[in-house]
Amino acid sequence: MDSTLAVVDAQPDIEALYRADADRLWRAVYAFAGDPEIASDAVAEAYAQVLRRGSAVRDPAAWVWRTAFQISRGALKARSLDATMSAPSVDHADTYADHDLLTAVHQLPEGQRAAVILFYYADLPIRQIADLLGTNSIAVRANLSRGRRHLRDRLGDHDG
């Protein structure tokens, strides 16, 4: 089968995946990167790449998520953003209930930020997060624990 036929065969499945999951993926990448342009570019490029690869991709949903986060990480590095990147603009921050929390999440180290966003914002299970990040469940749990501790230290304990 030539590559054109592979793309045509995969297209309906990828279109269905896009309709079902692209908005949630965009929100997760945006929460990670803090930049709506990076999020839009990363999601669009990830779906374009999975379409080009066609049936060669074993798990398109996981592949798209992993690729979108890799693209966003590359874009952040290219822009030389550091851990103290600014909070999202107010018009985009309105989609999140707690602007201070999102600002604090953006200041977490990359591994902790990715784990926290994928677990709490994208509502993904730990095993899937590990697969997306190319790590194991123990590392994800450790990053979640450290991330929560940093957030608690920064924001205080609001439970009591």
Regions found by a protein language model. Give the residues of each.
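A short, charge-rich alpha-helical start-of-domain segment used by transcription regulators
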Residues: D2-R27, E37, S55, R113
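Short, small-hydrophobic-rich alpha-helical interface motif
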Residues: L25, V29, A39-V50, T67-A68, ...
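Arg/Lys-rich amphipathic alpha helix in sigma70-family domain 2
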Residues: R52, D59, R66-S86, D94
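Helix-turn-helix DNA-binding module
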Residues: H106, E110, A122-A139
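DNA-recognition helix of helix-turn-helix
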Residues: D59, F69, L133-G156
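A short pre-motif secondary-structure segment
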Residues: A115-F119
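Acidic, proline/glycine-rich intrinsically disordered inter-domain spacer in sigma factors
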Residues: D2, V8-P12, A16, A78-H106
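C-terminal edge and immediately downstream basic/flexible tail or linker adjoining helix-turn-helix-like DNA-binding
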Residues: D2-A6, D13, L132, R149-G160
